[in-house]
């Protein structure tokens, strides 16, 4: 059977069309993910610059100033330097665990950004259990640290990995109980719904005023989860050289460095979403005729304003963990565990009980 030439051309053009549709579908999926990763990377560079400038101000010294004006590109220069460092492997360690550990830590933290609503219409995955997805994913990162410590075949690294796992377990429970209290107030586990519930009552509807005890517990627990001073025992230089990072160099060491600041940024973003109203400014925009509220703005303008408000709240809040790092001394391991199990856990349980009682009485 001979097929006519026009029919063959039609079949070829149809197959090309299907191939183009498949390519466009892949690009449609990869484009927002790539934009998110690029934006998050820029956000990390900004945090590194902010920390260096704030720490310089606290210590009354000049911060980075040689790599571009005001040292803005200093973090990028440091990252480029790490890329060209030699990638060393421990001679008697487990090379598989040693190599996989940093990747697990970074990927687990990056996935947490998928449920953060940067604006009302801008969230990568609006899930009904978004806030619990963040808690579940963040629990994977310490596994990567433990794998890194075990695979290094170094007693300091292994002890640092054990400390990271113990610290994460100790402070994840109070943090989860604080999140449960917020979910009870909002009647939802979706991050978008939690932001929307706070916007109903304006500035005074922020969960910061309705959950002051939970906010303090969440702040302390998130600092411990990020392993920031005074909770940086897994990598205490005076005790463990560099903890689970002792045997790392080059890009793998850079991954741990990036993971630390990614975790700090995502924790600050969740503080903004859970307690500071998210993308809602809660005051009218006086430059728009008719006093149109920013919260009700639609389209590109509303999305842009929402992103700006979210990031402004986040970076203003970041001053607290940065200033804390350069002002408070490191806790001992027994003090850290006592603070988590004997102090924060009972307080967070009591806060959850009070929140549940108030919700039942309001029915």
From Swiss-Prot:
TM ranges: 28-48, 98-118, 129-149, 253-273, 274-294, 300-320, 336-356
Disulphide bridges, residue numbers: none
Membrane topology classification: Multi-pass membrane protein
Keywords: Chloroplast, Membrane, NAD, NADP, Plastid, Plastoquinone, Quinone, Thylakoid, Translocase, Transmembrane, Transmembrane helix
Any one Gene Ontology molecular-function term assigned to this protein's record: oxidoreductase activity, acting on NAD(P)H, quinone or similar compound as acceptor
Pfam family, one: NADHdh
Gene Ontology annotations of biological process type: photosynthesis, light reaction
Subunit structure: NDH is composed of at least 16 different subunits, 5 of which are encoded in the nucleus.
Annotated family: Belongs to the complex I subunit 1 family.
Descriptive protein name: NAD(P)H-quinone oxidoreductase subunit 1, chloroplastic
Species assigned in the record: Citrus sinensis
